């Protein structure tokens, strides 16, 4: 069994080595059982327009492109900042409902709760013993978050990227959908995989990034910043559960400029261009087609047209979320089944890692 596993690992390594290290644009793939996708999302905060267009839509698509797909509600990551236990418990179920409503299908992918698979933390510890402290301290997100917290970040926040690497490598994932702000963390994952392989023999595939074609959705109030769950300005972020009235209000108040024409110029007209990009994404039209159809419309009217398109896109998802949240038992069962499937995969890999390291 060990020889078979090592042979399979070499096959995966040969495939990965044939690709250049780094990020790759999302390929149009036939289903391939030799490839595995992993991604995760924190349960805290309500899913917003940027999350949906930048991540969840591609998650749904990837289910049909790969035979092996795992999506995790990464609750361990969420406690790097203080959480109310009761709120966190409910947030996990709420995020499960949202993901299912958006199109994540447990028949096509494994949807599970990270904390219910203890191998994540076991592998994280092993990997943390292979990375130097300065490497983690120089990551952009660590510096940004500790600056915001007045340099009072926890050890958990510092080692967050190592747990993230363990999440990915634990399932011998070959592909990871990521946003632009996660590229540096993916480089750490790749380096840890290569470092482990160099020390213990070729075992982990070196995962490739799948960059979403949708650029980061910007804040409606500050187009220089990305849309965020934690933005204190309530008008900045469009949440998937917002009412039609709230969505209209947020787009009406969206920052643009003093030119009334609708054009796409991210460098020169960031606010309008952000709204055009959102419009294109929710309708499936190209940016050029959106601009063409908006000829003669001023930005005030155009913002309301985009609000209507977003409302139409989210309406069936909202209805399904409300329906799913009424059935707590179903949501818990989905997570239990998914976590059991993930545990089966994780246990095998973790046992092999323990043998290689010398624990067994």
Swiss-Prot record:
InterPro entries: aa-tRNA-synth_I_CS (IPR001412), aa-tRNA-synth_Ic (IPR002305), Rossmann-like_a/b/a_fold (IPR014729), Trp-tRNA-ligase (IPR002306), Trp-tRNA-ligase_bac-type (IPR024109), Trp-tRNA_synthetase (IPR050203). L-tryptophan binds at residue 167. GO terms for biological process: mitochondrial tryptophanyl-tRNA aminoacylation; positive regulation of angiogenesis; tRNA aminoacylation for protein translation; vasculogenesis. It catalyses: tRNA(Trp) + L-tryptophan + ATP = L-tryptophyl-tRNA(Trp) + AMP + diphosphate + H(+). CDD domains: TrpRS_core. This is Tryptophan--tRNA ligase, mitochondrial. ATP binds at residues 42, 48-51, 179-181, 217, 226-230. SUPFAM superfamilies: Nucleotidylyl transferase (SSF52374). Residues 1-18 form a transit peptide. It is an enzyme of class 6 (ligase). The keyword Aminoacyl-tRNA synthetase applies. It is found in: Mitochondrion matrix; Mitochondrion. The lineage of its organism: Eukaryota, Metazoa, Chordata, Craniata, Vertebrata. It is linked to Neurodevelopmental disorder, mitochondrial, with abnormal movements and lactic acidosis, with or without seizures: An autosomal recessive, mitochondrial disorder with a broad phenotypic spectrum ranging from severe neonatal lactic acidosis, encephalomyopathy and early death to an attenuated course with milder manifestations. Clinical features include delayed psychomotor development, intellectual disability, hypotonia, dystonia, ataxia, and spasticity. Severe combined respiratory chain deficiency may be found in severely affected individuals. Parkinsonism-dystonia 3, childhood-onset: An autosomal recessive neurodegenerative disorder with onset in infancy or early childhood. Affected individuals present with progressive movement abnormalities, including parkinsonism with tremor, dystonia, myoclonus ataxia, and hyperkinetic movements such as ballismus. The parkinsonism features may be responsive to treatment with levodopa, although many patients develop levodopa-induced dyskinesia. Some patients may have mild cognitive impairment or psychiatric disturbances. Catalyzes the attachment of tryptophan to tRNA(Trp) in a two-step reaction: tryptophan is first activated by ATP to form Trp-AMP and then transferred to the acceptor end of tRNA(Trp). HAMAP family: Trp_tRNA_synth_B (MF_00140_B). Changing residue 352 to K: In NEMMLAS; uncertain significance. One of its GO terms (cellular component) is plasma membrane. Pfam families: tRNA-synt_1b. Its EC number is 6.1.1.2. Brain. PANTHER family: TRYPTOPHAN--TRNA LIGASE, MITOCHONDRIAL (PTHR43766:SF1). GO terms for molecular function: ATP binding; tryptophan-tRNA ligase activity. PROSITE patterns: AA_TRNA_LIGASE_I. Belongs to the class-I aminoacyl-tRNA synthetase family. Keywords: Aminoacyl-tRNA synthetase, ATP-binding, Disease variant, Dystonia, Ligase, Mitochondrion, Nucleotide-binding, Parkinsonism, Primary mitochondrial disease, Protein biosynthesis, Transit peptide. It comes from Homo sapiens (Human).
